[in-house]
Amino acid sequence: DENLIAVQIDAAINFGNSGGPVISGGKVVGVAMQSGFFTENIGYMIPTPIIQHFLKDVEDGKSEGFGFPGFLVQSMENPAMRRKYSVEDDQTGVLAHKIYPNSPADGIMKVGDIITKIDGHAIQNNGTVEFRPGEYLNYTHWIDLHQLGDEIKFSIIRDDQPMEVALKMNRPGKEFLLVQPNQ
């Protein structure tokens, strides 16, 4: 299962009414969906970047989903953690605390790397990236914008040295689950 961006809207979408277009200013901006079985008068939509990703993905007749870079992170908001990893007060980023074997990150990133940017966007200590002035999304949204086969550039700090690395999204995230869906 993917954890993708959704937008809360001020239109009620009750059970069974998902799937229609969401229109704003005369343009389709997403697809209406219901996210909770027991919610009423709360609507959500799947925004166009996720829909565009899906449409590009299925051009070859199959849906592969979203890539997974192969690492897990921990926030760097705790001052003691920042001291332990020698992160300066003016530096932001997240700590790579797990690297999956045979993943895009395997052999490129290491546990203890501080990931400071994704595709040139600064990652905050809580794992968010500013996408509009004063508005933040989880850094994984920038991963989700990429198709399988794309390369994602990360800025990291390893052993107090800044580095640039690139990870090729070569496997869907579902391949890294311990139990595969629908089994």
Residues of each region from the PLM?
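Active-site region of chymotrypsin-like
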Residues: 1-40, 89-97
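Short beta-strand segments
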Residues: 5, 44, 163-167
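Terminal peptide-recognition signature
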Residues: 9, 18-22, 26-31, 46-47, ...
